[in-house]
Amino acid sequence: MKLAERTAADLRFARAGAHTVLTRRRHRWPFVIGRVFADPQDPGLGTLTLQNAAGTVIPGDVIRQRIEVVDGGRAAVNGQGATLISGVPGGDASAEETELYVDAHSWLRFDPAPRILTAHARHRQRTEVCVAHRGCAVVVDAVVLHPDLDAATFGSIESTVTVRSPGGALLAMDAQVLDAPPVTGRFTAFGTVYFVGAGFTGGHHEGPTDPPGVYTAVTELPNGAGCAVRIAAADGGTLRTYLRLLSAETAFQRASTRTFTDGMPFRRSQV
């Protein structure tokens, strides 16, 4: 993916001594980049909150970002909270384009927080992930439907996550589209957590029991790229709680091979 010159955030993390630090920090509106915090229990892990000063994405917005983790760095990049996707009748679609790169022996968790789809909003997300041998990335993609949405005001949200090798070869592509209200009102929040790279594969073990209001399933990605944990939840709060509980160890060691039934609301394609 070729990012345009006016990328909103261009960040590089690397290991420096016992810590992970930012070695490249370029950003503009709407992002605000603060400091990297070290975990007292795990000083090698650096955590950064990627703040959207606008707090919303409006029709016509195109937000591009690139994040790299190199030289054995271990970084967790989180959003400051759920972001509204605004819309107007007949308005332009908005878009977010993200490029993630993790080199050998480095680790990244990217959790930008759920997007909240509001009336008439049309939004596209494109995320490209490249993980070198012995590196790993955990990528969270989540959306919550605003409770006031109905068939007359429902717009659309499209999300495509692509996994490529360092040489550019396509390993996996997962595309999801939601352009109408779910058939039932049981689930209004949806997420997928992608575990890409060293050691992440779908297994044949029974997964943990789903908590009330949550349905989960695990998909093994093609070409040994990793696995994806799909989540449907009753609401945004339930989804966020489950995302916090979900760990890489759980997905790797206790992944199940269940798949969603045809009644799930997203149309999905995977190659």
Curated annotation (Swiss-Prot):
One of its GO terms (molecular function) is nickel cation binding. Keywords: Chaperone, Cytoplasm, Nickel insertion. Its main location: cytoplasm. InterPro entries: UreD. Pfam families: UreD. GO terms for cellular component: cytoplasm. It is found in: Cytoplasm. Required for maturation of urease via the functional incorporation of the urease nickel metallocenter. Belongs to the UreD family. UreD, UreF and UreG form a complex that acts as a GTP-hydrolysis-dependent molecular chaperone, activating the urease apoprotein by helping to assemble the nickel containing metallocenter of UreC. The UreE protein probably delivers the nickel. This is Urease accessory protein UreD. It comes from Mycolicibacterium smegmatis (strain ATCC 700084 / mc(2)155) (Mycobacterium smegmatis). The lineage of its organism: Bacteria, Bacillati, Actinomycetota, Actinomycetes, Mycobacteriales. The gene is ureD.
